[in-house]
Amino acid sequence: MEDGFSSYSSLYDTSSLLQFCNDDSASAASSMEVSDRIASLEQRVQMQEDDIQLLKSALADVVRRLNITEEQQAVLNRKGPTKARPLGQTLPLRTTVNNGTVLPKKPSASLPAPSGARKEVVVPVTKSINRTSSSERVSPGGRRESSGDSKGSRNRTGSTSSSSSGKKNSESKPKEPAFSPEEGYVKMFLRGRPVTMYMPKDQVDSYSLEAKAELPTKRLKLEWVYGYRGRDCRNNLYLLPTGETVYFIASVVVLYNVEEQLQRHYAGHNDDVKCLAVHPDRITIATGQVAGTSKDGKQLPPHVRIWDSVTLNTLHVIGIGFFDRAVTCIAFSKSNGGGHLCAVDDSNDHVLSVWDWQKEERLADVKCSNEAVFAADFHPTDTNIIVTCGKSHLYFWTLEGNSLNKKQGLFEKQEKPKFVLCVTFSENGDTITGDSSGNILVWGKGTNRISYAVQGAHEGGIFALCMLRDGTLVSGGGKDRRLISWNGNYQKLHKAEIPEQFGPIRTVAEGKGNVILIGTTRNFVLQGTLSGDFTPITQGHTDELWGLAIHASKPQFLTCGHDKHATLWDAVGHRPVWDKIIEDPAQSSGFHPSGSVVAVGTLTGRWFVFDTETKDLVTVHTDGNEQLSVMRYSPDGNFLAIGSHDNCIYIYGVTDNGRKYTRVGKCSGHSSFITHLDWSVNSQFLVSNSGDYEILYWVPSACKQVVSVETTRDIEWATYTCTLGFHVFGVWPEGSDGTDINAVCRAHERKLLCTGDDFGKVHLFSYPCSQFRAPSHIYSGHSSHVTNVDFLCEDSHLISTGGKDTSIMQWRVI
């Protein structure tokens, strides 16, 4: 425990505080102006508050660690010795509550769900976007959710810009599935089109369409999230006193303890998180999200959630029905105990609003700018001053009663930049900005005029500014990728350059001791010092992600995407084994059964084979000029089947353990693009699905279609990734348009079936899933289409990939 407290001492040096507080000369100096003396007292109070909050954080961490110990002991007592990873590593806190459901304010007799468990059913918010008066609703937890509008609400169009697609089901009643006991098939309908699926002979007599499928006894628990959203978000990286680095991707906020290699996850949001702020108490966190659309077409309004980073309890939800499109900037006030929160939305007017977040009341709002707003922050010593910056503007706002009054920053002799990209504050209350011209400008406290300028501090725009605890200013450049530190007189101290592979600096945060944390536009989180190297602690893809392949015998998987990267991941160490840049955007991948090579298909018709140990290129081929959606090796490793968007399946003979390829031919017969492929256990047959819901069977060695039902109905399939088939048709929801489900995978033990859909959900079914409307456990986390899912080699974990959210999520099967 002493080690735990020693880690906190590195965050704050209390000896300097005591020395400062005992020094009466500051207040006794006759030359000091009254305003400076007041500012000095404010600093003293703030430093004392920081120490108090530090002690609170330390105590909270002690409680967290004690609960981890209790949790581990309880598991050991219940299950006995086990080789499995300790429960405490994925359930760090026993008292944590259900990841985002708002808790009732009154005591409840029922116990909340554990924090680590994912929210399995999302209850969409149904409050209207357009409101004309104050309103409130009772949440499922029994807590009243105030609209936060005590003065009437702005009318909103409720436009949505979410990446999650919401498809309304057809108003006409869909046709029910039909069972033919004479022919032994089930017929279902997608968009009114019949899909006929023949069942094995031995199931015809016992099958009933009215039978009810059972929920699986196993469940999923989110264990790890790969990736970080730096490409289009700012100020979203912080170090908490508990030693956790907090950031977000998709709809999940990640709390990552790098030293202990543990992640916790706040999962209260139902769509993309776009902004994050940490309260002065260093425990309370606010996160804002975009608008979304639910599966049934209902709008999910943008809002801000305030939550406890120790327990993961949601404390307050504000702005439902007020914000438009997305919440892009948020910040807590500093000098009044963090009682206020400011937010900027993504409406055409980019409205700035100020909230008493504990009362969930809006104090004031005003049109901020017609142009993009990049940052909004409270002045550190004056609660009533807010600074916003963005395209062609820098504004100083004063909160007076229920109004916000604006003063524009005057550039005067200084050339006005096209973008003011970031803002921070000095110890004496000056405002400091970084702009697209590479200049650092200092604005005197209480004024809107420039008092000092550092011309050409960077080559190109300054994307981030961070004021360290010791008064050192750190600036991060975009174009030049440089990290530069400056003293109190704005003289350059140190300079470091981030390697080109990591991309431009997006945000800078202070870590432990002299460690600096950096988020980049290529979705890396780096840590290092100004005098040393920076190494990645988190990385992910930067463009749409579709390809996923699982190693046959190791806890490894490969992902590839439109960013032209193919990455092999270690699922145990949660880090990349290697990353390979390829020449074309990638779409699909597949491991050879030996695991020695992996094939990657692209959007251009080219496909590559790489050595999994060295990542060296083994061979490259081209088949057509359209997207290759599926790469699937036969179980015996002697064939490779490639499904293309030109409606054909290309078959290659494979020898030399996956290193030599000879084209056998192509299977033609589909009238639409190939979506999924599976091989039979004996490698003699192939089944395929297409974009127009066809199910066709093939003898791949001869590239001939098999039309005999008696031949195909009893084939045993080595894998089940086809979304259409008798054993999986129960995964389709009623009224589906046939494109809702992007991926299906069967566990190796053949008792579980998982799907990824267009609504950001991962579903876990029992296998076989051959009853209509089969029940499932539902898991949220992705904010875009779930493009692929697959179980690791021993079925211990499931991997899911997001499309536009570029995230990879690793779920533990429990």
Swiss-Prot record:
The keyword Oxidoreductase is annotated on this UniProt entry: no
Alphabetized SMART domains for the sequence: WD40
This protein's record includes keyword Ligase: no
WD repeats: 260-309, 314-357, 362-399, 408-445, 449-488, 492-529, 534-571, 577-612, 616-654, 663-700, 708-767, 774-813
GO cellular component terms attached to this protein's record: cytosol; microtubule; perinuclear region of cytoplasm
A GO BP entry: neuroblast proliferation
Region annotation (Disordered) ranges: 77-180
Coiled coil region boundaries: 31-72
Location within or outside the cell: Cytoplasm; Cytoplasm, Perinuclear region; Cytoplasm, Cytoskeleton
Transmembrane segments: none
Alphabetic keyword roster: Coiled coil, Cytoplasm, Cytoskeleton, Disease variant, Microtubule, Repeat, WD repeat
InterPro entries in the record: Beta-prop_EML-like_2nd, Beta-prop_EML_1st, HELP, Quinoprotein_ADH-like_sf, WD40/YVTN_repeat-like_dom_sf, WD40_rpt, WD_repeat_EMAP
Pfam families xref list: Beta-prop_EML, Beta-prop_EML_2, HELP
Effect of T242A: Impairs tubulin binding
Compositionally biased spans, kind Low complexity: 103-115, 155-167
Biased composition, class Polar residues, residue ranges: 92-101, 127-137
SUPFAM superfamilies recorded: Quinoprotein alcohol dehydrogenase-like (SSF50998), TolB, C-terminal domain (SSF50960)
Expression sites by tissue: Detected in adult brain cortex, hippocampus and thalamus. Expressed in the stomach, lungs and in Sertoli cells of the testis.
Listed PROSITE patterns: WD_REPEATS_1 (PS00678), WD_REPEATS_2 (PS50082), WD_REPEATS_REGION (PS50294)
Compositionally biased spans, kind Basic and acidic residues: 142-152
Primary residence: cytoplasm
Comment on protein domains: Contains a tandem atypical propeller in EMLs (TAPE) domain. The N-terminal beta-propeller is formed by canonical WD repeats; in contrast, the second beta-propeller contains one blade that is formed by discontinuous parts of the polypeptide chain. The N-terminal coiled coil is required for association with microtubules.
Family statement: Belongs to the WD repeat EMAP family.
Function: Modulates the assembly and organization of the microtubule cytoskeleton, and probably plays a role in regulating the orientation of the mitotic spindle and the orientation of the plane of cell division. Required for normal proliferation of neuronal progenitor cells in the developing brain and for normal brain development. Does not affect neuron migration per se.
Subunit structure: Homotrimer; self-association is mediated by the N-terminal coiled coil. Does not interact with EML3. Binds unpolymerized tubulins via its WD repeat region. Binds repolymerizing microtubules. Interacts with TASOR.
Protein name: Echinoderm microtubule-associated protein-like 1
